[in-house]
């Protein structure tokens, strides 16, 4: 049987995927104007979503599995920035790996708006965009995930884990002094505990680690809801900011676990030039 010739769309997506892979070896996030066109596969997906067509700026986030550390932490940051995004006229859409049940629980826990999240059973769009699939060594997804958690094939992961324990004076405070947080097996923790331990107005020691422990406890307690299949545990995501004319203003291609932003101290800092 003759092999069909590649279409213009296939060529454009392949060009972007190759560029995406090349970028993943260099800067993780950068203004993309003049560097790359918005891939047709992404534009086609957006064309089918009400309110995500041309005519306004759009922030499109491709999440890994909904039970992934990055997915929950990124969604929590985005949920807190919704008023600012709306004021800046930026429409938001996230696309994650999961199903409707995982979508419902994910949104209820993170506060991310249900109408702004789409789920795919398989990462076909991730693959079309050339996003990093993570380690794919022999042994299956679980050994590969554990290796990535140890920093193998996942640059920056260990440093980011450590930051969660040591604190970061360049990052904002995560837990209000009057807030109570339940993190897994630990007793309820008042936000004032972190103030006594390290002050206030910045990310205190153990503060981010406590938030991540709370996220992990939520996922592990409802594992098959969040992760219906283990096949794509290592798949990473990406961020795309589109101009009203469909040109690409910014992109970030995740290189590893806890790498959903080029500036994890301020994960949404890349939006500053467009937030007014």
Where are these regions (language model features)?
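Conserved helix-turn-beta segment immediately C-terminal to the redox Cys motif
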Residues: 73-94
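Short active-site neighborhood of thiol/selenol oxidoreductases, capturing the structured segment around
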Residues: 50-80
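Thiol-based oxidoreductase modules, predominantly thioredoxin-like and allied folds used
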Residues: 89-102, 115-121
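Thiol/selenol-based redox catalytic cores and closely related redox-interacting motifs
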Residues: 120-256
